[in-house]
Amino acid sequence: MQDPNADTEWNDILRKKGILPSKEDLKDLEKEAEEEEQRILQQSIVKTYEDMTLEELEDNEDEFNEEDERAIEMYRQQRLAEWKATQLKNKFGEVLEISGKDYVQEVTKAGEGLWVILHLYKQGIPLCALINQHLSALARKFPDVKFIKAISTTCIPSYPDRNLPTVFVYLEGDIKAQFIGPLVFGGMNLTLDELEWKLSESGAIKTSLEENPKKPVEDVLLSAVRCSVPAKRDSDSEDD
């Protein structure tokens, strides 16, 4: 097959007839074809990046040119942000059961900037069961906080049952708040929102509740008194 780029008399005739493109047009076509090839190649490289893990990107870093590295760095930051978000979301999310031998590792050495909420409980105490139920819901809602529970006497031998339930709030191994005994929690009327608010006051969780869902005792008593006293009739007022 004859080369259409060759400077032959026959090719010149074909160019004049418009059958072959001019040399200038041919160069433009070749340039466009080369640019298209580079574009397709670049898309293929980017797609390869998307299939790589962060570790694979690190391993193949020496094979990338300067333009590749800029594209990869942007993609790397995106993947890293997604990974961090996933790690945070899935960090805890449930209440972990521990015993006394796990205390130092799970509480004292829990980690920098990490809040830990520990519930000391015993089986057969209804309020302890209720708080465990509420803590499970809060653990799912606040997965960046470490919620743990332990049978009281496995952590503190001879710990009196009258002090149960007990909740300790820690930050970096230091106690920031403690709630001891049923009266602190308001008994079996304790709601999930009330417990969330109580824990948020210690700083352990960032609640979206705008106000304390539990009415002050004074307000409750005052409302009860008002409801129990009948309103005076107009005739009674006139007699006075």
UniProtKB/Swiss-Prot annotation:
Keyword Transmembrane assigned to the entry: answer is no
Q: Name one Pfam family in it.
A: Phosducin
Tell me which residues make up the Phosducin domain: 33-181
TM stretches of this protein: none
* Region annotated Thioredoxin fold, chain positions: 92-240
Q: Which organism is it from?
A: Bos taurus
Modification after translation is described as: N-terminal methionine acetylation destabilizes the protein.
Q: Where in the cell is it found?
A: Cytoplasm; Cytoplasm, Perinuclear region; Endoplasmic reticulum
Q: What is this protein called?
A: Phosducin-like protein 3
One GO BP annotation is: protein folding
Entry similarity comment: Belongs to the phosducin family.
Q: What Gene3D superfamilies does the database record attribute to this sequence?
A: Glutaredoxin
NCBIfam families reported in the protein's UniProt record:
phd_fam
Report the function annotation for this chain: Acts as a chaperone for the angiogenic VEGF receptor KDR/VEGFR2, increasing its abundance by inhibiting its ubiquitination and degradation. Inhibits the folding activity of the chaperonin-containing T-complex (CCT) which leads to inhibition of cytoskeletal actin folding. Acts as a chaperone during heat shock alongside HSP90 and HSP40/70 chaperone complexes. Modulates the activation of caspases during apoptosis.
Please verify whether the record's keywords include Cytoplasm: yes
User: Subunit comment for this entry?
Assistant: Interacts (via thioredoxin fold region) with KDR/VEGFR2 (via juxtamembrane domain). Forms ternary complexes with the chaperonin CCT complex and actin substrate, leading to inhibition of actin folding. Interacts with XIAP (via BIR 3 and RING domain). Interacts with HSP90AA1 and HSP90AB1.
Which sequence positions carry the modification called Phosphoserine? Answer: S44, S235, S237
List the GO molecular function terms: protein folding chaperone; vascular endothelial growth factor receptor 2 binding
Which residues are annotated as modified residue N-acetylmethionine in the UniProt record?
Answer: M1
GO CC field: cytoplasm; endoplasmic reticulum; perinuclear region of cytoplasm
The UniProt keyword set, sorted, is: Acetylation, Angiogenesis, Apoptosis, Chaperone, Cytoplasm, Endoplasmic reticulum, Phosphoprotein
